[in-house]
Amino acid sequence: MSTTNYPLLERVNDPADLRRLPRAELKALATELRAFVLESVSKTGGHLSSNLGTVELTVALHAVFDTPRDRLVWDVGHQTYPHKILTGRRDRMPSLRQLGGLSGFPQRAESEYDTFGTAHSSTSISAALGMALAAKQRGDERRCVAIIGDGAMTAGMAFEALNNAGVADANLLVILNDNDMSISPPVGALNRYLAQLMSGQFYAKARDVGKSVLKNAPPLLELAKRLEQQAKGMVVPATLFEKFGFNYIGPIDGHDLDSLIPTLENIRGLKGPQFLHVVTKKGQGYKLAEADPVAYHGPGKFDPRVGLVKPATPPKQTFTQVFGQWLCDMAEKDERLVGITPAMREGSGMVEFHQRFPERYYDVGIAEQHAVTFAAGMACEGAKPVVAIYSTFLQRAYDQLIHDVALQNLPVVFALDRAGLVGADGATHAGAYDIAFVRCIPNMSMACPADERECRQLLTTAYEQDHPVAVRYPRGAGVGVAPLPDLEGLPFGKGEVRRKGRRMAILAFGTLLYPALQAAEALDATVVNMRWAKPLDTQLLLQVAAEHDALVTVEEGCIMGGAGSAVAEALAAAGVQRPLLQLGLPDAFIEHGDPAKLLALQGLDAAGMQRSITERFGALPGEQALAAA
């Protein structure tokens, strides 16, 4: 991407270059940086609103702090495109979130300026505190800064870190990037507190009174300090963060470099834990994103002159949409149903449910642990909770899943979106481990629908059970198998034979059924749609094993401990010996890229399956070559 239109930005190859610029030019640099972010994301897709909102803050941080010696830890990290551009990766932005290209999140392996890898929320304060105390032990005076959003601040982990940091005597700066907008609208008492603090007549009046108090203060140092604290107390009544032991500064305008830079310079010289409250606006500087920051949170490619345009041909229904429609239909049928989400209303397909059944919709904020135990409590009182959560985020509530739900055998349905590889978001968001970590829990079951129709049917089956059940389904469009309008389920724990072949049987779990069927045509193999990773349809498995010379399992999840392992365990328990090939995700983190290309690289497309099977078991008589897609 050409930098011809960005003359100042072209001169900044690292933060040292930025610090050499005259302060008077930093505003112009921020303007160029914002335009560069917009142009870049419009060509590659990615996170936009959050990055447009952190431009000035990023410029100010690199202008004031001696990065990378001073540590910047970005919470979540999807707002770090300006940071990447200023830290030597400007010319690689066209590769953003593409196979072999820049990650959309901070990665330690990508740059020394990415001091801590992030993508899940609310980890920054803990990490920055650890860095600060490690530096203190070595006698190093470096500064450590955590930048965290108001949505991420609602998570319990953030408060655990604040509680520790307030008494740790570390040179830690926590910057609250208060933009009143996580992916879904932020909820909870903390966000209400921040909103009240920043809105209405009280803040304006208190600010004016504070200025008046300071203006009229006698020129006595101690009295002036006392009055300053009183004035600050009037602006920020009983400041929550000061109760944690932090020196609270703010709120200040996060888009005003004339405020940001001197404030950060003053803070840099202070000892102990500091808390800076910065107010920003998501989508700042691009009117379309300012008006609809959710739509521009993570857009695909678009023309910035006209904005997002709906495709002329409606795309295939997504699994997320299938879930959202099922949730509304089941809620109409059963008034006991309640829907729970940890701050992912839009991403989990719950917008319509929220609109139609607001009294039965619960957004608990970025609080996965609380969401799961909250669901358990509701189930104890006769409600029928459905927890809509990304597979990767359920990892954060594993103890609650075991201790609070499964141990008590409570009928909670977990709708696990983003199961398997997720493409551009990469390893941090991959739902690679859910089969393995769910199936080992007593009382838990795990369904793996192969398409949109089965997704709706298996959600119904899960809902009808009197114990906890997880239903996993991938991100994005289905295969085009339209769901049936009724709410009929499928038999619990039962699979089906989809294709009869000879010698060899492929046992497919989830959406890899369809490439398995393609591969089977060339191999003349039997294909079984297993549907359930737990309970395994052992009767069908043993029948298929008796009729075939070799077995293959395919799953879009980790091989270790996954569905293939369940098949191996069942065969061993029955004393059945059959050659078994397990295909799935390896013991490695799969980085970002196009989902189809990533599956092909792992040998999980039709051609890859045929290749792996042939290499293991040899060519079959009359086998046809399967052309790679």
Swiss-Prot record:
User: What HAMAP family would the database entry show?
Assistant: DXP_synth
The protein's name is: 1-deoxy-D-xylulose-5-phosphate synthase
The alphabetical list of record keywords is: Isoprene biosynthesis, Magnesium, Metal-binding, Thiamine biosynthesis, Thiamine pyrophosphate, Transferase
Question: Entry's SMART domains?
Answer: Transket_pyr
One of the record's GO cellular component terms:
cytosol
Q: What is the lineage of its organism?
A: Bacteria, Pseudomonadati, Pseudomonadota, Betaproteobacteria, Burkholderiales
Quaternary structure annotation from Swiss-Prot or TrEMBL: Homodimer.
Keyword flag Transferase: yes
Required co-factors = Mg(2+); thiamine diphosphate
Q: Does the keyword Membrane apply?
A: no
Q: Name one GO molecular function term.
A: 1-deoxy-D-xylulose-5-phosphate synthase activity
Pathway, per UniProt? Metabolic intermediate biosynthesis; 1-deoxy-D-xylulose 5-phosphate biosynthesis; 1-deoxy-D-xylulose 5-phosphate from D-glyceraldehyde 3-phosphate and pyruvate: step 1/1
Checking InterPro entries in the record gives: Dxylulose-5-P_synthase, THDP-binding, Transketo_C/PFOR_II, Transketolase-like_Pyr-bd, Transketolase_BS, Transketolase_C, Transketolase_CS
Recorded superkingdom: Bacteria
Please cite one Gene Ontology biological process associated with this protein: thiamine biosynthetic process
The UniProt annotation places Mg(2+) binding at: D150, N179
